[in-house]
């Protein structure tokens, strides 16, 4: 039972008091073997001993028990979905206050803390007066998960998102420290897994492992394009755009994960505006608006005939196959990306621009 940590607390408090198991046993009138079993979790003290132990160690009974409530994966998923929706229907401060209560209650449930951090950074922009403070809190949550979780994969994820929080907080040097070593070559675990499955004759499992490996690598490649476009210079801009569009078409990215394609179309449009090629920019914004209104609602990640195991893979995530924000907020952000982007201000009087903005409002 993960919620009860009395074994650990008795051992800890006894050592802090600098007494032996024998001395504690004599004080309570029990055997040394009983104390040993309590401290190793083989048995629990009788309920009548709890107030005596708490008084002896000068702690509350709750602290002695070490009660650390946990939440199951499906409960975390359901809670996250509800809170996402609440941000669109309830006052922002009310939802944030509920989040704080949940964090306090489940401060040792690290999978939940991780998702609460994700929830916060995906909604902190809804109140600009609190954005900085909330992003700082999210960063501290990811740091706590990184330092305390026994789940190695979760701790690694927490460190990555902690680095992302550093960027949100304009702390690039700290982000680099957290990301140190991330560029070192790493052997793909999925490829090794696929090889093992193949040797066992489990070909479907081998195929699934390879698909997941390829998909993860593909997403990493695509996520690099926006910054490449901004850093590549005028002479490389159209070459980078051309290469991205070939990758996007080859793997049907807009069907697979439209959310990674949308921001790149916006960056391409921005680049063409800055190059003075307004019609080219509008072509990509038109593509963006059509993609935003494509029939992929309800929002979730989907597979394709080539990537036919991806949907099932997403279902293994803690949040399952859902996006991190509510559909209402996502639709609003799609429109805001055009109207609130200063680069596109010069297009506001353009008839084509007005038409595609209206399309997003439909």
Language-model features: where?
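DNA major-groove recognition helix of helix-turn-helix/homeodomain DNA-binding modules
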Residues: 48-63
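Alpha-helical segment of the N-proximal tetratricopeptide repeat
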Residues: 74-108, 115, 122-129
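Short coil/turn connectors between adjacent alpha-helices in alpha-solenoid helical repeat scaffolds
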Residues: 83-90, 121-136, 166-174, 228-239, ...
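Alpha-helical protein-protein interaction modules
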Residues: 221-350, 354-355, 359-362
């Amino acid at each position: 039972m993960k919620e009860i940590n009395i074994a650990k607390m008795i051992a800890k408090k006894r050592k802090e008091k600098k007494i032996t198991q024998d001395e504690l046993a004599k004080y309570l009138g029990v055997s040394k073997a009983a104390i040993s079993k309590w401290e190793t979790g083989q048995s629990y003290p009788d309920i009548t001993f709890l107030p005596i132990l708490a008084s002896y160690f000068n702690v509350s009974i709750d602290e002695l028990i070490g009660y650390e409530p946990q939440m199951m994966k499906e409960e975390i998923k359901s809670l996250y979905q509800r809170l996402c929706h609440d941000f669109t229907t309830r006052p922002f401060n009310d939802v944030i206050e509920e989040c704080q209560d949940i964090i306090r209650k489940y401060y040792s449930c690290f999978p939940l803390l991780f998702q609460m951090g994700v929830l916060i950074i995906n909604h902190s922009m809804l109140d600009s007066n609190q954005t900085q403070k909330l992003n700082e809190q999210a960063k501290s949550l990811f740091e706590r998960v990184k330092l305390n979780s026994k789940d190695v994969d979760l701790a690694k994820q927490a460190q990555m998102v902690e680095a992302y929080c550093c960027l949100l907080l304009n702390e690039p040097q700290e982000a680099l420290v957290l990301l140190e070593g991330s560029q070192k070559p790493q052997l793909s675990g999925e490829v090794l897994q696929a090889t093992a499955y193949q040797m066992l004759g489990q070909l479907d499992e081998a195929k699934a492992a390879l698909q997941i490996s390829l998909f993860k690598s593909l997403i990493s490649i695509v996520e690099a394009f926006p910054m490449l476009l901004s850093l590549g210079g005028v002479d490389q801009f159209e070459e980078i755009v051309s290469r991205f569009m070939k990758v996007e078409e080859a793997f049907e990215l807009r069907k697979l994960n439209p959310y990674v394609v949308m921001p790149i179309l916006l960056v391409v449009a921005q680049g063409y505006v800055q190059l003075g090629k307004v019609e080219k920019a509008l072509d990509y914004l038109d593509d963006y608006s059509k993609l935003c209104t494509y029939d992929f609602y309800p929002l979730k990640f989907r597979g394709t005939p080539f990537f036919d195991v991806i949907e099932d893979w997403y279902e293994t995530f803690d949040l399952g196959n859902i996006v991190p924000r509510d559909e209402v907020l996502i639709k609003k952000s799609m429109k805001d990306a055009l109207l609130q982007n200063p680069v596109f201000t010069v297009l506001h009087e353009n008839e084509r621009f007005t038409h595609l903005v209206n399309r997003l409002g439909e």
